[in-house]
From Swiss-Prot:
Catalytic activity: N(6)-carboxybiotinyl-L-lysyl-[protein] + acetyl-CoA = N(6)-biotinyl-L-lysyl-[protein] + malonyl-CoA
UniProt subunit comment: Acetyl-CoA carboxylase is a heterohexamer composed of biotin carboxyl carrier protein, biotin carboxylase and 2 subunits each of ACCase subunit alpha and ACCase plastid-coded subunit beta (accD).
Domain CoA carboxyltransferase N-terminal: 47-320
Any one Gene Ontology BP term: malonyl-CoA biosynthetic process
Binding site for Zn(2+): 51, 54, 70, 73
Organism: Pinus koraiensis (Korean pine)
Protein name stated in the entry: Acetyl-coenzyme A carboxylase carboxyl transferase subunit beta, chloroplastic
Gene: accD
Pfam families xrefs: Carboxyl_trans
Its EC number(s): 2.1.3.15
Biological classification of the source: Eukaryota, Viridiplantae, Streptophyta, Embryophyta, Tracheophyta
């Protein structure tokens, strides 16, 4: 090889290296750009929400001021438990109960079929504890319900609010225990109980421990309603299904439902497969069920506090 040929080879190699470095630099810039875009999308998600019905883009602050009702079509979006507590409770009167109660994985439940929520875990490596931890971080709650004592237009009440954003509002041992303790305290202090239901039913990861909560809560309510003659109002929101519908959801002295809520025990597909026949559309929606006598009232969110206050007045409950 001549000296001239050697220099030409060096120039070719240098050019290839330069192109490679430029490509790597460009790829790195694209990656950083995409990363920045994802951060911007995260910020957008905290500021805007999309209506599940009409797909309108809704500004979160205005949506909360409108009690999570779409201003375009009137559709009721899901509310978290903290926002729901603010609806009926007077300002600075809320005193939460059992905030530090959390679930123990007594069954050592492990599912390979559940989707993974953690970046560093594959679904087959993720346990029930991992799922609980994920939702605790996402919602800021220890489990799928908040309970406490507050005042509604000056009337002391015991209030429990389920949160569907925490594992679909499923009822496990902690949810059942918190509701039972709330009812027992209300019974001891002669307070009315209001339960806001939003749940997919019993929590499968806790097996019979979850199913046992249905009987435990019903037993506490029996003493509250039958023995002490105290008022219990159940408010059903979308969705209320499964073991919650089959227990305390339908045990209220007065049962209130939100408009167009999905309320059921089993889903439509399960019913059709069991009965071997088709069922009509929307047969598990509030308005259809109300027409068949399952509820006492259908109340919109903006009227709820006034309606509850009037019911308490008719019941003769004293202001504090």
């Amino acid at each position: 090889m001549s000296i001239k040929e050697w220099f030409e080879d060096r120039r070719k190699i240098t050019g290839l290296l330069k192109n490679s470095v430029e490509r790597d630099s460009k790829d790195a810039n694209e990656t950083e750009k995409n990363k920045n875009l994802s951060i911007d999308y995260a910020k957008i998600n905290r500021l805007w929400a999309q209506c599940d019905n009409c797909e309108s883009l809704l500004y979160i602050r205005f949506l909360r001021e409108n009690q999570s009702v779409c201003k375009e079509c009137g559709y009721y979006l899901q509310m978290n438990s903290s926002d729901r507590i603010e609806l009926p409770i007077d300002r600075d009167t809320w005193h939460p109960m059992d905030e530090d109660m959390y679930t123990l994985d007594v069954l050592q439940f492990h599912s390979e079929n559940e989707p993974s929520h953690s970046d560093h875990l594959d679904s087959e490596d993720e346990s029930y504890k991992d799922h609980i931890s994920f939702y605790q971080i996402e919602t800021g709650l220890t489990d799928a319900i908040q309970t406490g004592i507050g005042q509604l237009n000056g009337i002391p009440i015991a209030l429990g609010v389920m949160d569907f954003k925490f594992m679909g509002g499923s009822m496990g041992s902690v949810v059942g225990e918190k509701i039972t303790r709330l009812i027992e305290r209300a019974t001891a202090e002669s307070l009315p109980v209001i339960m806001v239901c939003a749940s997919g039913g019993a929590r499968m990861q806790e097996g019979s421990f979850s199913l046992m909560q249905m009987a435990k809560i019903a037993s506490a309510l029996y003493i509250h309603q039958k023995d002490k003659k105290l008022l219990y109002i159940s408010i059903l929101t979308s969705p209320t299904t499964g073991g919650v519908t089959a227990s305390f959801g339908m045990l209220g002295d007065i049962i209130i439902a939100e408009p167009k809520a999905y309320i059921a025990f089993a889903g439509k597909r399960v019913i059709e497969q069991t009965l071997g026949q088709k069922v009509i559309e929307d047969f598990q929606v509030t308005e259809h069920l109300f027409g068949h006598g399952l509820f006492d009232l259908i109340v919109s969110r903006n009227l709820l506090k006034g309606v509850l206050s009037e019911l308490f007045r008719l019941y003769g409950l004293p202001r504090k």
